[in-house]
Swiss-Prot record:
Lineage: Eukaryota, Metazoa, Chordata, Craniata, Vertebrata
Record PTM N6-succinyllysine, positions in chain: K126, K400
Catalytically driven reaction(s): D-threo-isocitrate + NADP(+) = 2-oxoglutarate + CO2 + NADPH
Record-given protein name: Isocitrate dehydrogenase [NADP] cytoplasmic
Family: Belongs to the isocitrate and isopropylmalate dehydrogenases family.
Role, per record: Catalyzes the NADP(+)-dependent oxidative decarboxylation of isocitrate (D-threo-isocitrate) to 2-ketoglutarate (2-oxoglutarate), which is required by other enzymes such as the phytanoyl-CoA dioxygenase. Plays a critical role in the generation of NADPH, an important cofactor in many biosynthesis pathways. May act as a corneal epithelial crystallin and may be involved in maintaining corneal epithelial transparency.
Native organism: Ovis aries
Subcellular localization, as worded in the UniProt entry: Cytoplasm, Cytosol
Gene of this entry: IDH1
One Pfam family cited in the UniProt record for this chain: Iso_dh
């Protein structure tokens, strides 16, 4: 390349353990040699989050709000063991949750597909992108054990002082049982709808919302009605212009349809459905190491991309002992490419758009040419049958990607 591409403003969040090492390699070998970025870096390592009382996470989220593009390395969400290991002041919350709460928006997961990596669902030749509405429902519910016979009622008391409304949930006559009250908010459902419609337009794929509105006529019916109203008023003409569509589906029909389909659609799920189906779909494609995660805000303008996997602690322990590792960097690389592609779209930067696409193609072409990490070799041959000659180690694979990217960009005469 005769010159560096001017990339614009990007917020970068460093992470923990093996993914932190890979993150630095990605910047050094694949990004910085070709792209000149106005980079705003935040160290989200567990040590720095502890040192700053997690203020660094909030600062990073505010920076994403300002610059509209964030790329994030995987981070540790501490449990009791981690609190002990790092002598933390407290059990800090998930950085992803903190960022999502500040930005709003919906998390969309998408599989990265290579022809030579077998899929459990062989018919899925295109990704299925799942958008999970990560607010409310069972996750904010009040549930309790009903100790014995009696009535369970739900009461709504209007804040304007008008009469309250009481609904009978169940009259327990012979014994107790269990009960739950859950909720969602129109504003949150509206934001979920906008993020989903924006994602469909950007991918140029159809969108399906799944609910069980035949049973939960009012509750799930509200999701269905809000989506339909927003679609008809604000998105229908854009969808038709792009020759894509939006449809509501019953969750059981949708699950069956997804299994039979070839992929190539966005699936908007309520909170619990999204929790379950995103893992089920991820497994169907074969590997979490090949799964991207993108937070899309309702404005369609603000995006944060990351890998859908963790910090790969087991490999980091090996790395610390000086042992060889073969850690898959693909999802972390795609966090960068998705972030840069969005930056390119916002700025109408054709060179940057080409670069992001070229780097994604290099990743897939390299694997399809037989150069891969151990986890992918295991997908093909089965772990007990994998020999050392079947895969590259962490650093060899990054070098191979670097070589192939250099070749591709030279051929393109950028």
């Amino acid at each position: 390349m005769s010159h560096k591409i001017q990339g614009g403003s990007v917020v970068e969040m460093q992470g923990d353990e093996m993914t932190r090492i890979i993150w630095e390699l990605i910047k050094e070998k694949l990004i910085f040699p070709y792209v000149d970025l106005d980079l705003h870096s935040y160290d989200l390592s567990i040590e720095n989050r502890d040192a700053t009382n997690d203020q660094v996470t909030k600062d990073a989220a505010e920076a994403i709000k300002k610059y509209n593009v964030g790329v994030k390395c995987a981070t540790i969400t501490p449990d009791e063991k981690r609190v002990e290991e790092f002598k933390l002041k407290q059990m800090w919350k998930s950085p992803n949750g903190t960022i999502r709460n500040i930005l709003g928006g919906t998390v969309f997961r998408e599989a990265i597909i290579c022809k030579n990596i077998p899929r459990l669902v062989s018919g899925w030749v295109k990704p299925i992108i799942i958008g999970r509405h990560a607010y409310g429902d069972q996750y904010r519910a009040t549930d309790f054990v009903v100790p014995g016979p009696g009535k369970v009622e739900i009461c709504y008391t209007p804040s304007d002082g008008s009469p309250k409304t009481v609904y009978l949930v169940h009259n327990f006559t012979e014994s107790g049982g269990v009960a739950m009250g859950m909720f969602n908010q129109d504003k949150s459902i509206e934001d979920f709808a906008h993020s989903s419609f924006q994602m469909a337009l950007s991918k140029n794929w159809p969108l399906y919302l799944s609910t069980k509105n035949t049973i939960l006529k009012k509750y799930d019916g509200r999701f269905k009605d809000i989506f339909q109203e927003i679609y008809d008023k604000q998105y229908k003409s854009q969808f038709e212009a792009q020759n894509i569509w939006y449809e509501h589906r019953l969750i059981d029909d949708m699950v069956a349809q997804a299994m039979k389909s070839e992929g190539g659609f966005i699936w908007a799920c309520k909170n619990y459905d999204g929790d379950v189906q995103s893992d089920s779909v991820a497994q169907g494609y074969g590997s979490l190491g090949m799964m991207t995660s993108v937070l899309v805000c309702p404005d369609g303008k603000t995006v944060e991309a990351e890998a859908a996997h963790g910090t790969v602690t087991r490999h980091y322990r090996m790395y610390q002992k000086g042992q060889e590792t073969s850690t898959n960097p693909i999802a972390s690389i795609f966090a960068w490419t998705r972030g840069l592609a969005h930056r390119a779209k916002l700025d109408n930067n054709k060179e940057l758009s080409f670069f992001a696409k070229a780097l994604e193609e290099v990743c897939i072409e390299t694997i399809e040419a037989g150069f891969m990490t151990k986890d992918l070799a295991a997908c093909i041959k089965g772990l007990p049958n994998v020999q050392r000659s079947d895969y590259l180690n962490t650093f060899e694979f990054m070098d191979k990607l670097g070589e192939n990217l250099q070749l591709k960009l030279a051929q393109a005469k950028l």
